[in-house]
């Protein structure tokens, strides 16, 4: 009798993706973050669904409804903070996942990499719209500032901004449509994730050595299911600690003040996971230039497969590239810090230098280092 797991049309898909999937035997814990991102997505959809049951997308009651969730709904405070801090964990895993892809040369899987970039943009859009929903001061002014950036587009900019706002300022129409998009986008993310996995399983996973591992594969279950569970436990402990002990650690105190169009906060800043891009945006004095730099800071990832000159796929055996990679990581941390600082010296010049360093590392130094390493290895 044949195993139903291998023959039934539904279980066959699950079997080929998560059970009998041939996986390289040497992949490290850096490969855990894909499954952790899946877990984060599930947590966000579930907590988001329960929040949507009590939330009202109306400018007069949105702030009160979030307060009502925290005070009157059973474990509403926990659901709300799981959702808010779950987004932070999502981005933490996302950044590590992308970093691993760069370090071990996974960007050579073109389709998987490009769908990953689309996923990054979609997740960023979802998080931005979610931040607007509590309708606090930072929600309102964040929405105003970021949507206003589109007015830098020549000819159609102003019309485009008013079209997105649904009026002449951020108001009820904006909040309602942001709620609608924030609700639908996670399901689009889920669909894109399925396509991401589909393309990944066409080529098979990369591994730390960067070499083909066809001769040395093991089944995903039980080896990597067990290994992933360890990551899941670590993630849940971190998230629970954050939610139960310091739920507002990563938030902004200004968002506990109801939105007031007549009072601008002294310092408008997004959540921590957008600060690096916000710092790049602010480092250019020109509005259109800043917007282009902001988009380029993410889109530059799409150029990585074409800028790669190395004969070895992984950075595992390339110490010069490793130094450059960790310099890039440190640079992104500096940008994140600068994004949260006021626009004054010395922060302005540090932000500008860090932005130049970010783009030149990826566009100039990395390809040159690749060529130098090829030369040193007589390739």
UniProtKB/Swiss-Prot annotation:
Complex and partners: The cytochrome bc1 complex contains 11 subunits: 3 respiratory subunits (MT-CYB, CYC1 and UQCRFS1), 2 core proteins (UQCRC1 and UQCRC2) and 6 low-molecular weight proteins (UQCRH/QCR6, UQCRB/QCR7, UQCRQ/QCR8, UQCR10/QCR9, UQCR11/QCR10 and a cleavage product of UQCRFS1). This cytochrome bc1 complex then forms a dimer.
Organism: Loris tardigradus
Protein name: Cytochrome b
Main location: mitochondrion
PROSITE patterns: CYTB_CTER (PS51003), CYTB_NTER (PS51002)
Keyword Transport annotated: yes
One of the record's GO cellular component terms: mitochondrial inner membrane
Function: Component of the ubiquinol-cytochrome c reductase complex (complex III or cytochrome b-c1 complex) that is part of the mitochondrial respiratory chain. The b-c1 complex mediates electron transfer from ubiquinol to cytochrome c. Contributes to the generation of a proton gradient across the mitochondrial membrane that is then used for ATP synthesis.
The organism's taxonomic lineage, starting at the top: Eukaryota, Metazoa, Chordata, Craniata, Vertebrata
């Amino acid at each position: 009798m044949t195993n139903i797991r291998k023959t039934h049309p539904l279980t066959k898909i699950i079997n080929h993706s998560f059970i009998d999937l041939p996986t390289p035997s040497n992949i490290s814990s850096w490969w855990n973050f894909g499954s952790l991102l899946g877990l984060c997505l599930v947590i966000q959809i579930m907590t988001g669904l329960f929040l949507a049951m009590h939330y009202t997308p109306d400018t007069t009651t949105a702030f009160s409804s979030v307060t009502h969730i925290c005070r009157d709904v059973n474990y509403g405070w926990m659901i709300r903070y799981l959702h808010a801090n779950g987004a932070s964990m999502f981005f933490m895993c996302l950044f590590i996942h992308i970093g691993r892809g760069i370090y071990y040369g996974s960007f050579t899987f073109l389709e998987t990499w490009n769908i990953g970039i689309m996923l990054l943009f979609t997740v960023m859009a979802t998080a931005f719209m979610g931040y607007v929903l509590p309708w606090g001061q930072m929600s309102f002014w964040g929405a105003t500032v970021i949507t206003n950036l589109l007015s830098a587009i020549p000819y159609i900019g102003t019309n485009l901004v008013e079209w997105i706002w649904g009026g002449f300022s951020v108001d009820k129409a904006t909040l309602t449509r942001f709620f609608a998009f924030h609700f639908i986008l996670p399901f689009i993310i889920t669909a894109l994730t399925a396509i991401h996995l589909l393309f990944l399983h066409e080529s098979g996973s990369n591994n730390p050595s960067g070499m083909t591992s066809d001769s040395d594969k093991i089944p995903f279950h039980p080896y990597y299911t067990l290994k992933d569970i360890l990551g899941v436990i670590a993630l849940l402990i971190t998230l629970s600690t954050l939610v139960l002990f310091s739920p507002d650690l990563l938030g902004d105190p200004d968002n506990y003040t109801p939105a007031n169009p007549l009072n601008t906060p002294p310092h408008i800043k997004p959540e921590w996971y957008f600060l690096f891009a916000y710092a790049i945006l602010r480092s250019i004095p020109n509005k259109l230039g800043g917007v282009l730099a902001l988009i380029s800071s993410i889109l530059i990832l799409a150029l990585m497969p074409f800028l790669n000159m190395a004969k070895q796929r992984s950075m595992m055996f390339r110490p010069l590239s490793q130094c450059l990679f960790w310099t890039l990581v440190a640079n992104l941390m500096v940008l994140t810090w600068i994004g949260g600082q006021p626009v004054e010296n010395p922060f302005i010049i540090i932000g500008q230098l860090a932005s130049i360093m970010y783009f030149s590392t990826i566009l100039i130094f990395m390809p040159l280092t690749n060529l130098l390493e090829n030369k040193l290895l007589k390739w």
